[in-house]
Amino acid sequence: MMLKQIVALSGPRCCGKSTIAQHLVVNHGYIRIAFADALREIAETAGPDFANDRLYLARLGDKLRSQVPDFLIQAVKNRLELTHGPVVIEDIRFPAEIEFCQSIGATTIRLEIPIETQRERLAKRDGKEEHESELLIACMDEHALDDVIDWDYRIPAIGDFRELALAIHTGISQSNITQANIQDRRKNTKSSKGGESI
């Protein structure tokens, strides 16, 4: 088990995971790691446009996971071993990824937004037409964690993301969370909806 403060974020596309992670990096000294980093590196070999094409990355991730299920987990694990200080993993999308994050004592956070807000943010962020946005929302990774109940925290991803990042950082720092009591709390919340609010 790794002995460092790790925050692991999950949520649908455009819920603010990357923005909140960036605030944690800039304002609170976290180191950012993403499961998708390895995908971007692979996609970049096909050309720089592919590394930023979210639909292409989602499909590449699906294909890669079907052939080498723990490839992205191993890539994150290797990066974690090289980092010192607090870490934010910004993109949990699959059950194996949340299980990995929980196994290393990460504080898991599910960001939630209404689907209408997600559609609006996708159109604004990516300039996607409605059809393209629906393809992104329909990707396998978009709903893989919908039924997970044992998040440490569930947070509505609305409002000022800088304030949400501060609440996450402050809530975790002030709660004096240790890896042992995270595991205990997870055992005690398995039967509930899961997750506290910060």
Regions found by a protein language model. Give the residues of each.
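P-loop (Walker A) phosphate-binding loop of NTP-binding proteins
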Residues: 12
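Small-molecule kinase domains that catalyze NTP-dependent phosphoryl transfer to phosphate-bearing small molecules
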Residues: 71, 102, 111-176, 181-194
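Hydrophobic anchor at the beta1->P-loop junction of P-loop NTPases
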Residues: 9
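Hydrophobic positions on the alpha1 helix immediately C-terminal to the Walker A/P-loop
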Residues: 20
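ATP-dependent small-molecule kinase phosphotransfer cores
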Residues: 31-87, 93-96
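Walker A (P-loop) ATP-phosphate-binding motif of ABC ATPase nucleotide-binding domains
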Residues: 6
